[in-house]
């Protein structure tokens, strides 16, 4: 595609073209009919400055990996799925404040490292309907590390998120508080290295918390389990390398379950760090 701007009207032709089997040598790529960007479609298209695809709803894995875009125009409100590593390491010029109201599926590392990079600085992300559904391939079977190393990310809104993926916010060092009201499970290493995280509020549906999900959260003060009716399962290493284990942070639970938590399997190791939510309204907001 030697022209500086390529505009196509036959969407069937474009479905064939956008398969990473051609060279993009122009500076601008625009099409108003394409709805799906296939895997690696713009992979390492380093000469490309601008992509305009307003009809796209699905973004394939590694779609913008290795690009140097200065402008990416998508109708973000219509995006339904984003594949593995699509915007990894800041490629693709993602907006600083990103809302994806239609998004239902995310691939591993989709936005990993998309902060303080050459092309983007993702600051806030809102995922109103995402429940944790993933996009997988033969080599990556889950949505691990979706936002890992987004060091400028300060705010996350995912009110419908059920399963917090493994390593999903690892080393997001600008995060200070997080709320996941419907989370049922927390993956290993989900918040590892979030060194400014002081408070995390998990709703009453949580049933399990996996290994080291809060490790090296060096400013953590409170893990709040608001509304739980049973004691969630934890592993031997769930609170490894945390301020909870060192006696500097607390787990806040409903008063009616405080004593149950303190004698529960593995929780009993942290009995001195378990407090009743009702006794600390300034911290727990109740």
Where are these regions (language model features)?
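Short, low-complexity, Pro/Ser/Thr/Gly-rich segments in the mature regions of secreted, periplasmic
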Residues: 279-285
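Structural signature of tandem-repeat unit edges
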Residues: 1-36, 46-58, 67-81, 92-105, ...
């Amino acid at each position: 595609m030697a022209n500086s701007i390529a505009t196509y009207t036959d969407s069937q032709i474009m479905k064939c073209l956008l398969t990473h089997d051609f060279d993009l040598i122009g500076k601008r790529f625009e099409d108003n009919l394409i709805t799906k960007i296939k895997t690696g479609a713009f992979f390492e298209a380093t000469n490309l400055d601008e992509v305009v695809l307003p009809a796209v709803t699905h973004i394939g894995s590694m779609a913008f990996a290795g690009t140097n875009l200065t402008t990416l125009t998508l109708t973000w409100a219509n995006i339904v799925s984003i594949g593995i590593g699509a915007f990894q390491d800041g490629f693709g010029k993602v907006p600083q404040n990103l809302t994806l109201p239609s998004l239902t599926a995310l691939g591993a590392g989709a936005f990993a490292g998309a902060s303080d990079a050459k092309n983007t600085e993702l600051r806030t992300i809102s995922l109103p309907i995402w429940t944790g559904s993933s996009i997988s391939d033969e080599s990556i079977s889950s949505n691990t590390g979706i936002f890992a190393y987004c060091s400028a990310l300060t705010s996350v809104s995912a009110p419908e998120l059920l399963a917090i993926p493994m390593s999903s916010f690892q080393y997001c060092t600008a995060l200070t508080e997080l709320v996941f009201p419907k989370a049922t499970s927390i993956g290993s290493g989900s918040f590892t290295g979030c060194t400014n995280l002081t408070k995390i509020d998990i709703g009453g549906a949580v049933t399990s918390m996996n290994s080291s999900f809060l490790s090296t959260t060096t400013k953590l003060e409170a893990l709040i389990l608001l509304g739980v009716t049973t004691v969630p399962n934890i592993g031997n290493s769930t609170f490894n390398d945390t301020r909870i284990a060192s006696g500097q942070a607390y787990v806040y639970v409903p008063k009616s379950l405080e004593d149950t938590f303190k004698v529960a399997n593995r929780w009993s190791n942290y009995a001195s760090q378990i407090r009743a939510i009702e006794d600390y309204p300034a911290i727990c907001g109740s």
